[in-house]
């Protein structure tokens, strides 16, 4: 019969485990669990609000890791050090996969349950997530208008303004292709970093050359596939976002003032790496 893990006389196999943490760092200390687990403050009396809060808090934690990986990967691409970037981009793709599955947990909330907590949310909305906005900026989907929801937080606004003015991951990849001898229109290389990524024929032609000769451009070829994998996972996350929101609130407006599902459906048309998708039709 197994012994209770909280017994004062632990089983023999526990004898080498540290059990006294009065003078050393414990698991909870290292992870700062005291603050993390006390950061949930439901405003309504409804049981289901805890799910809503934790769903969004954990998403923000995963996005923090995404930003950590994306910024490092972008710097490696800028320096032409692609192998380290591959691991980081693969990790971001798997984080998106994790977030795709997480929607299934929120989808256990019914319309009636959400209706009970919605009045307590005010105008707070995932649309206002500054981390999500920075992820989009790093990946090339930029719009200065999307800085406005953060104007009331000068420190966040300053960070996002710096992010939108910094070349995107894809900009750095295109610059690397030019340095690798592939022909890129100088106008594309001189493009204002604050603009969103648009299709460029010279970039598509360069990627076509890479895909036609993968052994000659192996690292760029691998980078292209990492980008495709990342955007594929991102698209799945966006789609699952739409279906989860529609399942819970239908076509009601979002709390942040957007069209709700209508707005999210428009976001499904966003393409981060347009030439990489277009080139597949001409190989």
Swiss-Prot record:
Superkingdom assignment: Bacteria
Q: Name one Pfam family in it.
A: Trp_dioxygenase
Record InterPro entries: Trp/Indoleamine_2_3_dOase-like, Trp_2-3-dOase_bac, Trp_2_3_dOase
Gene3D superfamilies hit by this protein: 1.20.58.480
Q: How is the cofactor bound?
A: Binds 1 heme group per subunit.
Which residues are recorded as binding substrate?
Answer: 52-56, 114, 118, 255
GO biological processes: L-tryptophan catabolic process to acetyl-CoA; L-tryptophan catabolic process to kynurenine
Pathway given for this chain reads: Amino-acid degradation; L-tryptophan degradation via kynurenine pathway; L-kynurenine from L-tryptophan: step 1/2
Residues at which heme binds: 241
Query: Which SUPFAM superfamilies does the record match to this protein?
Result: Indolic compounds 2,3-dioxygenase-like
Report the EC number(s), separated by commas if there are several.
Answer: 1.13.11.11
Q: Which UniProt keywords apply?
A: Dioxygenase, Heme, Iron, Metal-binding, Oxidoreductase, Tryptophan catabolism
Kindly list the GO molecular function terms attached to this UniProt entry: heme binding; metal ion binding; tryptophan 2,3-dioxygenase activity
The reaction(s) catalysed by this protein are: L-tryptophan + O2 = N-formyl-L-kynurenine
Write down the required cofactor(s): heme
UniProt-listed HAMAP family: T23O
Annotated function: Heme-dependent dioxygenase that catalyzes the oxidative cleavage of the L-tryptophan (L-Trp) pyrrole ring and converts L-tryptophan to N-formyl-L-kynurenine. Catalyzes the oxidative cleavage of the indole moiety.
Subunit structure and binding partners? Homotetramer.
**PANTHER family referenced in this protein's UniProt entry, alphabetically:** TRYPTOPHAN 2,3-DIOXYGENASE
Please report which protein family the annotation says this sequence is part of: Belongs to the tryptophan 2,3-dioxygenase family.
The protein's name is: Tryptophan 2,3-dioxygenase
